[in-house]
Amino acid sequence: MSKRQLVTQSRRFVIKIGSALLTDNGRGLDQKAMAAWVEQIAALSKKGYEVVLVSSGAVAAGMTRLGWKSRPKAIHEQQAAAAVGQSLLIQAYEQEFQRYSKKIAQVLLDHDDLSSRQRYLNARSTLRTLMNLDVIPIINENDTVVTDEIRFGDNDTLAALVANLIEADILCILTDQKGMFDSDPRQNALAELLFEKPALSPELDNMATSGGALGRGGMISKVRAARLAARSGASTVIVGGKIPDVLPKVANGDMIGTLLYADQQPIAARKRWLAGQLQSRGVVTLDDGAVSVLRDKGKSLLPVGVKAVSGHFTRGDMVVCKDARGAEIARGLVNYNSDDARKIMGQPTTKIETLLGYKDFDELIHRDNLVLS
């Protein structure tokens, strides 16, 4: 039985549109293309779907207004282009959505907005309020102020985090390809489109190697986004943006594109927030016993199971937990700073106070502040 019924039963969509589908070969906004996207989104909204749009295009629009022929390499110049272009992008959307009497809202997010629990909850409340008011939020990364070190990396990731934030049913990533293929269609004429796969399928890992089918065209980031969205129970459709009326067809469950469906129970809201933390301050390496305790028993991480500590972090920072082979097992908020963690690693809880002169917690990371990768 097809999993497309997951889509037809869904009412809350996050739609991500990349620059290639909004601009005229990178030479500024393509108003005709934008009009077509707005028409489709307005049609979904009229049918009762809740839609949040994650839109690229600000940098390209700014470059055109500034008279730049090629994308600048310097981050401050990219940020300047984004600052100029963001207003143009929203003006273009406002002009088109007015044709359908639809209200829109501009929302700019950066990593700090989602890494702070309070700001995360505020963003969620704002987006929910906008949707209740029948306003379509248009979201982009706040390129003007963000630094390279804390960028989301791409709008695929941002869209997945937004899907988690609002507990969306479907994340729809529009691309310049028809979807995901089992091999590179540019090299293999017999390459077949993958219609449906579990978001956590190991087969996708094998394909996502440097020489695999997903190693080109940004598909690796789309798989990562699908897996992140799956944590809140959202399924992801990766589909070609050149298909006529693609969004209504996706909503109708047509067999187009690739559906990477969530086949696990959604994790709790706090753990969704933890899973979305992209910036970690350190790494703790675990022994096999600790790995088993986290994976199989869902317990807290005790110092005795830690073999090594790297990085510099303070209490409350995000750290990554890895096994002896370097594979990420989990991530969580640490109860001790890096210096103290090194002193107590490999030691039983009963020795913490002797080693540190104090003991605030038995656990290095409590299970409530830990999420499996």
From Swiss-Prot:
One of its GO terms (cellular component) is cytosol. PROSITE patterns: GLUTAMATE_5_KINASE (PS00902), PUA (PS50890). The keyword Amino-acid biosynthesis applies. ATP binds at residues 16, 175-176. GO terms for biological process: L-proline biosynthetic process. InterPro entries: AceGlu_kinase-like_sf (IPR036393), Asp/Glu/Uridylate_kinase (IPR001048), G5K_ProB (IPR041739), Glu/AcGlu_kinase (IPR001057), Glu_5kinase (IPR011529), Glu_5kinase/COase_Synthase (IPR005715), Glutamate_5-kinase_CS (IPR019797), PUA (IPR002478). Its EC number is 2.7.2.11. This is Glutamate 5-kinase. It comes from Teredinibacter turnerae (strain ATCC 39867 / T7901). The gene is proB.
